[in-house]
């Protein structure tokens, strides 16, 4: 029975190994998955974690990011508590090696931010409830298993803004002496690791089998 279970696990790993990780010219591993942390998000009052998955047979990927607002340094001293979720779809330009998760890209995004905070002007607890549709452009670098993602973008925002204009995923225009609650800006850096999800699971199961 134990040999049968081991055989099934090995076969499953062989089937999914090629889908989660391939080799390109020069024998370099081409990972299809990554998990990332938004660099410096903690100092602005939140912790952001992202998962990205390359799509098979296409220079595209899907990316989902979740943010816990309040898990970080209280930059504006207003005790924010809430969350942000965002989804982006990357369209990569072709490059010389065509790693699935590397290269220049364009990314349309949808973001929703919801949190309560202490409003300095009213002295009450207020709600910031905002959504945004953005277009971003950036570059993602992959080195072995390590990944760095840099981007900047802008788009249309809607909802009930906070007095700081910062929504832990995008910021409303409030520079040059002007404010615009419908113009959202986004720019940041994400750092992370690439991996093969099925191969990692396969190894973990084998290690925990009884001997």
For the regions a language model picked out, list residue spans one by one.
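Residues that define the transmembrane beta-barrel architecture of outer-membrane proteins
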Residues: 29-33, 43-47, 79-85, 102, ...
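Outer-membrane beta-barrel pore domains and translocons
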Residues: 40-42, 65-69, 109-113, 153-159, ...
